[in-house]
């Protein structure tokens, strides 16, 4: 029987970042409405000792469970759609480029790899990535989809379909009076975790990556309480009332689920200069020193003033609270 393959590197209850959140949204909102028989192929080993659950009825195969079947499914599919792929070349993609119908781009590696230079950080903390591959796979695919809010260099090289992610505001909490800063993100360079050094803060991230910053950038983080990231605890962390300012100062952020969560949970964020830059918002920073100044500025605000700033921006962000529109745009591509 003929079928389409949807290729990913993760998903289900195994969530490490925004791309996994995106895949789970796709499984819930798009997969049930696909017209053609389909399979989800996850190109990695299933984690040992972990039960990864999926909210979908679509057939799922992990590459590590049956490499031979995985390759057969890839090589014999009608169409291949990359939901989230690796940022370096792989022969399973290149040998099936004539089947490659679409690819979803979740981050601009071109911009992301420049973050260290832009922020003045001598050593780059980054996942394995090759910007040449991003361009190559985009040129192989019939359709290229970008999930972000702003244009990226790839827009100048290929035709790109812009389908920004969505976020549903379900909490709409008010700000509190805490001046403690919270950080809930991966520790790659463009997220600027070193901005927290010397600031009373909480960090909800990967402990191993956090130690990299202590070893390579000589951050002491003596005022930071560290909590190992586990996605099932994300809402508990944002719901805490012992922090009130969000370190959302992430450079070249494609969409920013964690930033939307900060607005949703009443954590007034400090943003980078480039995130929705057309919206007038006073609490932005580019350097570590500017970040500290903005922490001080917010600390001098009343709770009402914080709510006013947060509320105005949150209302603006509701334009991305559009789940049905988001899924319809993808279905138009996949069911065509």
Each predicted region: which residue ranges?
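Conserved active-site histidine-acidic residue motif and adjacent donor-binding/catalytic loop
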Residues: 63-69, 210-211, 215-216, 220-239
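Membrane-proximal helix-turn-helix segments that form the acceptor-binding/catalytic region
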Residues: 107-145, 239
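Conserved donor-binding/catalytic core segment of Leloir-type glycosyltransferases
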Residues: 171-191, 200-202
């Amino acid at each position: 029987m003929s079928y389409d393959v949807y290729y990913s590197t993760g998903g289900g209850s195994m969530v490490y970042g925004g791309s996994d959140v995106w895949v789970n949204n796709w499984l819930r909102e798009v997969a049930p409405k696909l017209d053609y028989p389909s399979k989800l192929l996850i190109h990695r080993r299933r984690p040992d000792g972990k039960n990864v659950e999926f909210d979908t009825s679509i057939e799922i195969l992990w590459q590590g469970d049956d490499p031979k079947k995985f390759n057969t499914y890839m090589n014999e599919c009608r169409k291949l759609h990359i939901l989230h792929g690796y940022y370096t070349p792989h022969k399973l993609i290149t040998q099936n480029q004539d089947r490659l119908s679409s690819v979803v781009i979740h981050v601009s590696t071109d911009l992301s790899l420049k973050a260290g230079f832009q922020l003045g950080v001598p050593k780059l903390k980054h996942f394995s990535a090759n910007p040449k591959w991003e361009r190559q796979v985009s040129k192989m695919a019939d359709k290229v989809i970008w999930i972000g809010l702003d244009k990226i260099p790839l827009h100048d090289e290929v035709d790109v379909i812009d389908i920004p992610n969505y976020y549903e505001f379900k909490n709409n909490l008010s700000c509190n009076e805490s001046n403690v800063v919270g950080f809930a993100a991966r520790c790659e360079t463009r997220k600027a975790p070193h901005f927290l050094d010397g600031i009373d803060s909480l960090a909800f991230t990967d402990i191993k990556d956090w130690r990299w910053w202590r070893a390579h950038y000589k951050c002491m983080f003596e005022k930071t309480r560290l909590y190992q990231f586990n996605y099932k605890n994300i809402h508990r962390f944002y719901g805490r009332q012992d922090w009130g300012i969000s370190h959302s100062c992430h450079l070249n952020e494609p969409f920013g689920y964690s930033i939307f969560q900060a607005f949703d949970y009443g954590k007034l964020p400090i943003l980078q200069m480039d995130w929705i830059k057309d919206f007038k918002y006073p609490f932005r920073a580019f350097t570590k020193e500017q970040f500290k100044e903005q922490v001080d500025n917010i600390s001098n605000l009343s709770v009402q003033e914080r709510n006013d700033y947060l509320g105005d921006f949150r209302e603006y962000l509701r334009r991305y609270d559009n789940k049905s529109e988001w899924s319809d745009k993808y279905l138009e591509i996949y069911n065509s």
